Design a protein with these regions (language model features):
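Conserved alpha/beta core of the MobA/IspD/sugar-nucleotide pyrophosphorylase nucleotidyltransferase superfamily
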Residues: 34-115
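Conserved core of the sugar-phosphate nucleotidyltransferase
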Residues: 1-59
Length: 115
């Protein structure tokens, strides 16, 4: 539940084909009932060169400015964003405390020091 109320965690709503419909730093959909389910955006982006060109040529639109979620730049200009569900757990690194936690986890990785 902490991720749901954490404004550093971006939540995403997807359609039945796992295309992004909306992002927010607040709980979406609104939890009017106890059946609300939340998906967290991991924030790992894969672009073709042409996609990067489109992203860089478009200016931030209103929702990107309001939510501080850069993927709104594409959604607001009519582009679709394919999401991929994963069961992997991730942590966000937004604060010095998060960085300490991430560093401690990396040091436990058997490949630490090789990357």
């Amino acid at each position: 539940i902490s991720d749901v109320i954490d404004t550093n965690t971006v939540k995403v709503i997807m359609d039945v084909n796992q295309k992004a419909l909306a992002y927010s730093r607040h709980p979406i959909p609104f939890p009017k009932s106890n059946i609300a389910k939340y998906d967290k955006q991991l924030g790992l982006y894969a672009f073709k060169q042409s996609g990067l060109q489109v992203f860089s040529e478009n200016l931030p639109a209103s929702l990107e400015k309001i939510e501080s979620v850069e993927m709104y730049r594409l959604l607001e200009h009519g582009y679709s964003i394919q999401m991929v569900k994963t069961n992997d757990v991730s942590i966000s690194v937004d604060t010095p405390s998060d960085l300490e936690q991430a560093t401690a986890l990396m040091k436990q990785d058997s490949l630490f020091g090789k990357y």
